[in-house]
């Protein structure tokens, strides 16, 4: 998605209102930062770890700055199922509103799952239950086709490298947690 300069400036301004260390945003965006990871801290105290040499910043921008989920009504006692949780950006966003409910997050790819666990742990999110698993129509081992950006893996794109992962059915998730 091409973004014009005005939109980019608005996004940076929004970052100054959400993140205490917003000044790191352009360093990650322009790939100037020499670290593998960065942790953004919100004014509300959430810490968000992401990889600097990936599309994690784009995902952070979509969830936290563009606010793709702002029209979702998330209530205090909701049960949320985050399928393809990636590094937990939506999970962290939802955790601000769903404080007495439960958030189940499913991420089958080890590199993403590891950062997801870090994000859950460093924020002491007791109501978040992570699973290193894909979600599909049945209990099985399935192929996930890896995308080089670590954010767009798919069960339906056989043009890229396949990774075999465990899968749980949505029916089982609901049956076991109802």
What are these regions (language model features)?
Residues 1-178:
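Phosphate/nucleotide-binding beta-alpha loop and adjacent structural elements of enzyme active sites
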């Amino acid at each position: 998605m091409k973004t014009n300069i005005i939109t980019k400036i608005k996004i940076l301004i929004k970052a100054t209102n959400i993140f205490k260390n917003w000044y790191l945003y352009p360093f990650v965006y322009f790939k100037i930062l020499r670290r593998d990871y960065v942790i953004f801290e919100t004014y509300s105290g959430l810490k968000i770890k992401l990889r600097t040499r990936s599309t994690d910043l784009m995902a952070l921008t979509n969830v936290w700055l563009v606010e793709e989920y702002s029209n979702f009504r998330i209530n205090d006692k909701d049960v949320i199922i985050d399928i393809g949780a990636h590094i937990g950006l939506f999970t962290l966003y939802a955790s601000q509103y769903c404080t007495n409910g439960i958030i189940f997050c499913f991420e089958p790819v080890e590199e993403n799952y590891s950062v997801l666990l870090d994000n859950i742990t460093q924020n002491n999110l007791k109501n978040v239950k992570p699973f290193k698993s894909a979600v599909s129509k049945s209990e099985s081992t399935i192929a996930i086709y890896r995308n080089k950006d670590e954010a767009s893996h798919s069960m339906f794109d056989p043009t890229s490298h396949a990774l075999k992962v465990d899968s749980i059915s949505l029916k089982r998730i609901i049956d076991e947690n109802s």
